[in-house]
């Protein structure tokens, strides 16, 4: 049975697509209304729409917007057109010229009486329907105008009324003439003047100037000047605001009366607005003002591929008001399209249904196995049951949704011309034409997806059609190759369907009896031929149709030179940075081994480690032909884990292609190109990224199956995760190379732990097998190594030890090695030197010296020599005899350090005593200094052997010191105060020696001085207290005798001052206490004086005080003299005036003691004259400075 005989309606009948302008004749409209399928979804949408529309008929509403959304091809434009017929209730004639209104076509399609009633209510309401595609009605550059929407609304509104649409100010003139009743008269006059009808000529506004002006002046109230002025200024003065437009529409509706409606039906408004917030704002204001002004009498219906919420969200501004106006929102889904096609095209007659049911029953399992897709494909519908098969045959269910995606992809990527049919009717036509092509095929035939190419070929861009045409004319290709090529084009932009061999075979199935295995072979052969002709490209497992531009780009990419070394380098980067990312192998929680990375013969990164991971690729193997034996030898020789990858070069080929693409893009990055080429470059960049993902996958698989060689053996590691396989290999390598790694069982993690180890109360180290130290084997290894090098006189540093034991066969950590060095150092097995100075365990920065980079190359390590017991005994004996200490350590360093502590303590005591010698002579200073010198000699020695030898050398010196220093210390403890008193008496005598002539005093002083100045006076110091007592008593007695005449002089001077003061009673109280206190002070000091010379000096001090006091009295008396006054005359009082300055004699007070100085001996008259002469001369000299001299 032929397929065409199965259908209920003739498959070859003429079905129009969406009716365009010029096709709206009754015949086409009749067929459109008659065959329109009301699906369940459409029934629901119609119910919602007419329910909302009814509110504007029966009442008032400002929610007068309808937003119809749906994907490309969902039938929204057709739905909008049908609504326009229903709202207008358009009347059409059938073939028999019987008039039928649009609503009546739906009497049997709408089974819901409520919906049908609402439809009839709308149809019975007079309505002006304005249906238009906004893109075709707007000016070419209108999108840049923020008022573009309202201008289009105004244009179509004017056209609906018969006014000029393209020139809005002419439409305003026409509207005004209609109001004035002059419009028909004007048109007749214009035609009479111009010879052309007004409707024909008004578009040529600027060529009909004279005719327009003359007609206006003759038929309207305008004069010729006024008409000319309007003509010249009309365009400049014209402006249409949204508010003015809304009012104009309202006035029109009100003028019509009888509940008249106007409906604007705008197709593709969503696409027109796009992401332009200015256009969205303009639409919002237009709809809002119309809603407010017209109250539901004017409606706006629009279509968009996006729902309104998405459009508002995309624009990102506040368009909440427009959402409120478009309260009715209808969304068409793909299920609606499927249902329409099934009912209009694929509906079967009874014979066809029976035939197909039997066919499905016999082949259902075959169909399930035949129609399969790869696992990475999105859901593709297949025949679910018998009814499904009957409804869809000869098509397959997945083809409905897939063809929609094809149409959308072609449109989005610009592969279609301007006239690719839109919406449900496009799919309808495609399915009808494909069915027609296979109409004569027998039952069992299935329509391959490639058949849909012919249905859209006429609408495709020439660049696509050219590729197919050239393929058809290519003698190296056959017809089936071209069909595969067409298929690859159709699914080129469908991401949900990878164009791999499995999917291509399913899409190319033409009959239920097809052998899919053979089909794949046939398709694969076609793909190979197409690839050779550069018509397609293989990307991984997918095949991609290439446009002419893409073919050109691919040829350029293919010619890009890529060095194989760069390919290997990039593969290495993927292996070592993506697949196996670890930079260190974690052998255990404590041991992480760094390793070198090599691929073929190319090192990746620095090669500074003892072990490595080496990858052998097919490229390297092809040039060297390594067999297993050679790889085993290589693994032993290089201390590497070696992985030989399988011979599959997929990842190498992919990487080569990636590098070619990158090279092409780099060269073209600064070159201007067409938009098509730029798009291809973007896709190529994306392709390179996809290939990178595949490289990762291919390399991972290769590593899973790679042969592994370690330490001259091939490992039997099962196929599993590459990281686990490599880690297993590294473990074997470490176990073999680092066979003494297990010597370390207790680990050090921080420098703090080293410090704690350093201060542990353990000094003895035993290297025997019974030692409890968990790391004894490791410590012994380090000790033996230091011993060997010291024996050979080789200098070794901390750095050298660390380097040695971090390598094979040890592999120990730096901090662990440092701990072993510390243990040996504390155990006195080794010595450490920094800048030729020996270090001790008490060094504050010892851990830094052993671990820090700044020091490890400077700290020298030597095996330590043992100190003899005899030398250690010397130190112990001296400790006992010199310092009286017997509790001492038994180890070399401990004993040395303890003895040094004793020496430091003694040195501190000596320093304290030596301070006493700074200002005073004391006995025993030489003993202390000699002892200090000996101590410092030992303290400056850090080397243990040198220290013990030096102690032996200074043994006698220390014993002598111990004997000599005892009386010195005793002196400072008990005798120093008596000694200081004696020295004080010597100093007193020395100061008064001139005045003291008594022989007894001199004798006492001599005895005291003999004892004090003796080198070792300690045994005679007990005599000093008696001598001091005798000296003090006699010295005081002599001093008191010397002070007696001085006291008399002081008293005499005091009386002289009082006599003078008593002469002036008016000032006595002023000076008395002051003078008395001054003289009492001198007397008191005289009573406490200790020296003769101080007592004698007080006599002169008293004389000077006397003179100063008398001067004070004289000055005060002079100051108190009254000023000169003038007497009163008559009524005038005495005026006090300053005294007249007159010559005044200068007075001077001189002590009598200063007139005659020295001792005078008078034996005769001449001597008397001489003395008097001396007195005279002195007085004369004093008179030179004063007129009056007063002797006191």
From Swiss-Prot:
Quote the InterPro entries the UniProt record gives. BREX_BrxC (IPR047679), P-loop_NTPase (IPR027417)
Sorted alphabetically, which keywords does the UniProt record give? Antiviral defense
Up-regulation conditions: Part of the brxA-brxB-brxC-pglX operon.
Biological process terms from the Gene Ontology for this record are: defense response to virus
KW Zinc-finger (keyword) present: no
Family, per entry: Belongs to the BrxC family.
Q: State what this protein does.
A: BREX systems (bacteriophage exclusion) provide immunity against bacteriophage. A core protein of a type 1 BREX system. This system allows phage adsorption but prevents phage DNA replication, without degradation of the phage DNA. Methylation of bacterial DNA by PglX probably guides self/non-self discrimination. When the brxA-brxB-brxC-pglX and pglZ-brxL operons are transformed into a susceptible B.subtilis strain (BEST7003) they confer resistance to bacteriophages SPbeta, SP16, Zeta, phi3T and SP02 and partial protection to phages SP01 and SP82G (these include lytic and temperate phage).
Identification of the protein by name: Probable ATP-binding protein BrxC
Q: Which species expresses this protein natively?
A: Bacillus cereus (strain H3081.97)
